[in-house]
From Swiss-Prot:
Protein name (record): Histidinol dehydrogenase
Lineage: Bacteria, Bacillati, Bacillota, Bacilli, Bacillales
PROSITE patterns cross-referenced by the UniProt entry: HISOL_DEHYDROGENASE
Organism: Staphylococcus aureus (strain MSSA476)
SUPFAM superfamilies with a match to the protein in the record: ALDH-like (SSF53720)
Family per record: Belongs to the histidinol dehydrogenase family.
Cofactor note: Binds 1 zinc ion per subunit.
Keywords, ordered alphabetically: Amino-acid biosynthesis, Histidine biosynthesis, Metal-binding, NAD, Oxidoreductase, Zinc
UniProt-listed CDD domains: Histidinol_dh
HAMAP family: HisD (MF_01024)
Length: 418
């Protein structure tokens, strides 16, 4: 990829729609089939799409516990440390009900959702971290029923995924994936309970099903390909940056990587190191396609221009690896998560840092946020007025109702004034 100056990049920068519209009829048919035929449809789709025969959709509590008990100690400790850090961070940011003075007449109270479905991807890799980064949040929120769905595998669901479900006290785990699992969580089947909200990343079928069913069920987001944008200078460890780029690229051929810098020579040096390391990289087929088609080097003329490019991209992950990263914290506004300094690589945020790795993609960071414990709470506004307060504001209320020609609204006020 040739180096672009900031203006050249901004002139050509665009993101394709994250979803393939041609999938719509397929998604609609899958959802309808699950709505009508329930578990029978799910087993059929497991065979058709995942080439796995599943006599029992639910994985028993005994199997989940056995997965944890038999897990090697190092993996168990790593998952446990991740869980503890996520739990501590989410507890620190959880919205709580405040003890209020009697004179407070308008306030908010929070309640946990009753039931949540979590989609845990399968296929190209196993993702116990997704369980930790979603189910822990629901647990901290106080969600009563946490349900995980994950695609069936010929050799069974990943033991690491099941162990993470045990650690986070997930209530039920079902081996079903794709759009059909989202439909099952939305409508309910003979085996899978209907939930109030569905969270977790997935492929285009999962994303489109969430979009299609939103309104009948709550969702976290419609995720596109993963992405990272880095701002670097001559103090950055370029060999480390190479693997920050590769780490993102290995997720998906469509993963997008951007490197921004004010020093053109640093960017050229980085690109030569990427080219040198690429032939021997793990997961070469995926990484090489991502680098060939979705990798950008952007030369910014100054600090403000670098920040402007970053805010325009509005990436899922932003990494600042410069001699003085502090000023970027205020200036870089629209990102899913902001990783500051050499010892805060994006990858540590994928696993153990604390905040959830479920983050907005495809420029949606310009108007939405990463998943947090507060996404598993409802917020109710309470209005409890005294007679004195009512009398102070009633005339304004009834007059606005009159202006809007909503006379029953007006009468609701007037009858209380008489």
């Amino acid at each position: 990829m040739p180096m672009l100056n900031a203006q050249q990049f901004l002139n050509q920068f665009s993101l394709e729609a994250p979803l393939d519209e041609s999938l719509y009829p397929i998604i609609r048919d899958i959802c309808q089939e699950v709505k009508v035929h329930g578990d029978k449809a799910l087993k059929m789709y497991n065979l058709t799409f995942d080439h796995t025969k599943t006599d029992h959709l639910e994985i028993s509590h005994e199997q989940i516990k056995a997965a944890f008990d038999t897990l090697d100690e190092k993996t168990k400790q790593a998952l446990q440390q991740s869980y503890e850090r996520i739990k501590a961070y989410q507890e620190s940011i959880k919205q709580t009900n405040q003890q209020l003075e009697e004179s407070v007449e308008c306030y908010e109270i929070y309640h946990p959702l009753e039931s949540v479905g979590i989609y845990v991807p399968g296929g190209k890799a196993s993702y116990p971290s997704t369980v930790l980064m979603t189910a822990t949040l629901a647990q901290v929120a106080g969600v009563e029923n946490i349900v995980v769905v994950t695609p069936p595998q010929p050799n069974g669901v990943s033991q690491e995924v099941l162990a993470a479900c045990y650690i986070t006290q997930v209530n039920q785990v079902f081996q079903v994936g794709g759009a059909q699992s989202i439909a099952a969580l939305t409508y309910g089947t003979e085996t899978i309970p209907k939930v109030d909200k569905i969270v977790g990343p997935g492929n285009q079928f999962v994303a489109y099903a969430k979009k299609y069913l939103f309104g009948q069920v709550g969702i976290d987001q419609i995720a596109g390909p993963t992405e990272i944008a880095l701002i670097i200078d001559d103090t950055a460890d370029l060999d480390a940056i190479v693997y920050d780029v590769f780490a993102q690229a290995e997720h998906d051929e469509l993963a997008r990587t951007y490197v921004i810098g004010e020093d053109a020579q640093v960017l050229k040096d980085l690109e030569s190191r990427i080219a040198k390391a690429l032939p021997n990289v793990d997961r070469y087929d995926i990484v090489s396609k991502s680098i060939a088609n979705q990798h950008y080097l952007i030369h910014a003329s100054n600090f403000d221009e670098a920040c402007h490019v970053m805010n325009t991209i509005a990436p899922e992950h932003a990494s600042i690896q410069t001699v003085n990263p502090q000023p970027y914290i205020e200036k870089v506004k629209y990102v899913g998560a902001l990783f500051i300094g050499h010892y805060s690589p994006e990858v540590i945020g994928d696993y153990v840092a604390g905040p959830s790795h479920v983050l907005p993609t495809n420029r949606t960071a310009r108007f939405t946020n990463g998943l947090s414990v507060n996404d598993f709470l409802t917020r109710n506004t309470v209005i409890h007025l005294s007679k004195d307060t009512f009398e102070q504001i009633a005339d304004s209320a009834q007059h606005i109702a009159h202006v809007e020609a909503l006379y029953n609204h007006q009468q609701s006020i007037l009858i209380r004034q008489s």
